[in-house]
């Protein structure tokens, strides 16, 4: 899609966007450090695939900045958006270095990863936003529920009062119709 971007400043981590994300897509952040990715890892020297999540269609999840993945991934994933697919070229010092990762990755290997950022989310048990913001939101919801309950109770009371008033009016009309001299044998003069 474009030229490779030098993310490390020394040519050690190059990123080339294969598919752009939607403009409003989210990116990993301090609030959303856990990422889910699909990837395919290739040895640059012989283009042999050494690892992929595509075969079993399971995403690989990890938290950025914890050292749980190679340095190039921490650097590159922070620049991606959900839905983006990028080709990341990693020099050995940003991958597995002199040690490699036997048996699949030899020492001093340059690696190429095609990575799709599938999702980013908060740490388990954490929420986006601060605890005080969450408390304030819950307090506001509680107040809204109390106001709604009071309004409902008020409406119920008004309906009961209206029913009682209507019953009193009907009773008054019935009593008026039964006035003196209109009933059977009551007070009729002969």
UniProtKB/Swiss-Prot annotation:
Its EC number is 5.2.1.8. GO terms for cellular component: cytosol. The modification N-acetylglycine is found at residue 2. The keyword Acetylation applies. Residues 149-163 have a biased composition (Basic and acidic residues). Gene3D superfamilies: 3.10.50.40. Keywords: Acetylation, Isomerase, Rotamase. Residues 149-190 are annotated as: Disordered. It comes from the Eukaryota. Residues 179-190 have a biased composition (Basic residues). PROSITE patterns: FKBP_PPIASE. One of its GO terms (molecular function) is peptidyl-prolyl cis-trans isomerase activity. It catalyses: [protein]-peptidylproline (omega=180) = [protein]-peptidylproline (omega=0). Residues 32-121 form the PPIase FKBP-type domain. PANTHER family: PEPTIDYL-PROLYL CIS-TRANS ISOMERASE, PEPTIDYL-PROLYL CIS-TRANS ISOMERASE FKBP20-1. Belongs to the FKBP-type PPIase family. PPIases accelerate the folding of proteins. It catalyzes the cis-trans isomerization of proline imidic peptide bonds in oligopeptides. This is Peptidyl-prolyl cis-trans isomerase FKBP20-1. The gene is FKBP20-1.
């Amino acid at each position: 899609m474009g030229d490779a971007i030098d993310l490390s400043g020394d040519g050690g981590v190059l990123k080339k966007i294969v598919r752009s994300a939607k403009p409003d897509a989210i990116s990993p952040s301090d609030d959303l450090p856990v990422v889910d990715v699909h990837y395919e890892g290739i040895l640059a020297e012989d283009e042999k695939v050494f690892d992929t999540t595509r075969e079993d269609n399971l995403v690989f999840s990890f938290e950025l900045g914890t050292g749980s993945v190679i340095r190039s991934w921490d650097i590159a994933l922070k620049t991606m958006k959900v839905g983006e697919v990028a080709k990341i070229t990693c020099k050995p010092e940003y991958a597995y270095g002199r040690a490699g990762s036997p048996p699949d990755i030899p020492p001093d290997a340059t690696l190429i990863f095609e990575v799709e950022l599938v999702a980013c989310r908060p740490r388990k048990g954490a929420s986006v936003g601060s605890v005080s913001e969450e408390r304030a939101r819950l307090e506001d919801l509680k107040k809204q529920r109390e106001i709604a309950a009071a309004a409902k109770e008020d409406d119920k009371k008004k309906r009961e009062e209206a029913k009682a008033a209507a019953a009193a009016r009907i009773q008054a009309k019935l009593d008026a119709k039964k006035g003196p001299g209109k009933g059977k044998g009551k007070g009729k003069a002969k």
